């Protein structure tokens, strides 16, 4: 475990949950950075900086890692990637209740929330968010900036593309691959591959456009 301090970008609800995870993992969160909360001096007892990310990055403190706690997948990944280009280290946050296989790989800036399971030889890309009790089974791949909602399940050898979202309790069946910028609705069951920018809902999951085409007139 790193002994570096952490600054969290984003002080909304997600940022506060990330701070809780960091503290349970024994990490020291020295500040939130969020201009939207410029009137707050502290949140959860943690100082709030009203700087923009750019201002913060231009004067980055020593022995400090960054964690980006922004719900928007594209923006979270963009900020994390900008930090990496500037040589700013990204924290990896793993709740003590999460189970991570020693053969799994977690990229920079990933969070594994309470109850998460990441099994053998799974891969989770930079700035991906694995939310409460989500499961990433053996050999599954989670793209950069993706978000698995609470209770989502990626069964064996599945793949989720960059910046994609898998909703609460949704499931990808074994071997299914979905592309970049895909959105899977809550409780959907994805039984076949889906291309970039698909919007999938239902059991079995179908593209929203396809569902509209088969609606009775």
Spans of features found by a protein language model:
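Phosphate-bearing ligand-interacting subdomains
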Residues: 39-99
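Short amphipathic alpha-helical segments
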Residues: 19-22, 78-82, 124, 195-196, ...
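Short helix-capping segments at alpha-helix termini
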Residues: 26, 84-88, 192
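Structural signal for interior beta-strand "rungs" in well-ordered beta-sheet cores
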Residues: 92-208
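Hydrophobic, well-ordered beta-alpha structural blocks that scaffold small-molecule cofactor pockets
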Residues: 1-49, 56-58
């Amino acid at each position: 475990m790193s002994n570096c301090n952490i600054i969290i970008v984003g002080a909304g609800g997600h940022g506060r949950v990330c701070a809780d995870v960091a503290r349970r993992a024994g990490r020291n969160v020295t500040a939130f950075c969020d201009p939207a909360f410029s009137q707050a001096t502290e949140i959860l007892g943690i100082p709030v900086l009203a700087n923009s990310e750019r201002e913060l990055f231009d004067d980055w403190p020593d022995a400090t890692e960054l964690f980006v706690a922004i719900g928007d997948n594209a923006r979270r990944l963009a900020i994390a990637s900008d930090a990496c280009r500037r040589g700013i280290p990204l924290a990896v946050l793993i709740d003590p209740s999460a189970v991570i296989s020693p053969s799994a790989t977690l990229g920079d800036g990933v969070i594994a929330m309470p109850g998460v399971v990441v099994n053998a030889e799974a891969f989770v890309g930079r700035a991906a968010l694995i939310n409460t009790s989500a499961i990433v089974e053996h050999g599954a791949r989670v793209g950069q900036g993706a978000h698995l909602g609470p209770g989502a399940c990626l069964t064996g050898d599945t793949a989720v593309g960059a910046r994609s979202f898998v909703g609460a309790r949704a499931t990808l069946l074994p071997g299914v691959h979905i592309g970049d910028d895909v959105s899977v609705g809550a409780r959907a069951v994805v039984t076949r591959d889906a291309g970039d920018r698909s919007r999938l809902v239902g059991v079995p999951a179908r593209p929203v456009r396809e569902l509209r085409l088969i609606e009775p007139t």
